[in-house]
Amino acid sequence: MRTNQKCLAVIVVLLVGLVLAYGAMDSALNRSKKELTSPIATAQNAIHIPGSTIEINQSFSTIDPASQWVVVSKQFPLANPAYRPADLHKVSVASRLDKPDDELSLRQKVEPSLTAMFAAANKQGYAIMMASGFRSYQQQQTYFDSYTAAYGREKAETFSAHPGQSEHQTGLALDIAYTDMNNCYLEICFGQTPAGIWLAAHAHDYGFILRYPANKTAVTQYQYEPWHFRYVGKPLAKALYESGFTLDEVKPYLEKH
Ligand SMILES: [Zn+2]
């Protein structure tokens, strides 16, 4: 009996000891976890684009067509030509109504930033609209064929994408114009209009970038398009604006993170 009681006591002491030791270990582990995820880890994972002070604490694929950082260009066509975003929806901002519903649509996730940017532009007195949003592969094919017929292939290629190579197909890009289509509608002079100047200077505050700048035609392989804006989210948009780099130029850099 005595021996049994002693044994029991020893077991109880051992169990209590184990529980206490586990508790101490657990809190020590939690403490070190916290230390690892706060400032040090953040600093290590943040992306800094050279020439910008912005710390980008998010990261997205540059290849996945559903990613807000995807690069779709002549060099990097969509892997799946039939790609169509799952969350396409008709935008609520002013848009060119004589276009098919598809083209009046963008991805749902762009909507809050788009409405905020248009509201700010309207407040400045600029009556603007979305002239073109999402374009399916077939739609782009139709446009490219008609431009080729009108201007010849070489000229058409400077301003119109081959189907599968247009970022309009991601539902993250849009063309912006004055509602008055006589005012530099999808023309280079739009960049010199008050709305064009304002958009170039403020789009990044809403997560958009001027995708084909005048001084980067050799990099983007597209002519200067002061009307074409692309959603990438605020941190990257601000970093690109500050640094002067295009999305194409930072692609390899973003992929390292
Ligand atoms: Zn465009």
What kind of region is each of these model predictions?
Residues 2-132, 137-257:
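Extracytoplasmic cell-surface/polysaccharide-interacting catalytic and binding patches
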